[in-house]
Amino acid sequence: MGLTKEHKTEIITKFGDSATDTGKAEVQVALFTRRITDLTGHLQQHPKDKHSRRGLLMLVGKRKRVLNYLKKVDIERYRKVLADLDLRK
């Protein structure tokens, strides 16, 4: 299932400053991560879905670029996002 409006607002309020703060890097990374986990589950059920696999790889690339930006701008926020989302060990 896709990302519903309720899940999206929940993620935005958890990682953003307000309910309308969608541009913050932490919010973007959290939304990308949620979409990536959903697509990963879909691809485990449908391994031959090449179009969704390409979308997944593009999302991973977008998340990587935003994380690199966040690391360059503010390393403490970067580390907090990694810890909150359990991205890297």
From Swiss-Prot:
Q: Name one GO cellular component term.
A: cytosolic small ribosomal subunit
Q: Which CDD domains match?
A: Ribosomal_S15p_S13e (cd00353)
Determine the domain of life of the protein's source.
Bacteria
Q: List the PROSITE patterns hit by this protein, alphabetically.
A: RIBOSOMAL_S15
Q: Which UniProt keywords apply?
A: Ribonucleoprotein, Ribosomal protein, RNA-binding, rRNA-binding
What does the annotation say about its assembly with partners? Part of the 30S ribosomal subunit. Forms a bridge to the 50S subunit in the 70S ribosome, contacting the 23S rRNA.
Reported function: One of the primary rRNA binding proteins, it binds directly to 16S rRNA where it helps nucleate assembly of the platform of the 30S subunit by binding and bridging several RNA helices of the 16S rRNA.
State the protein's name. Small ribosomal subunit protein uS15
Gene name per UniProt? rpsO
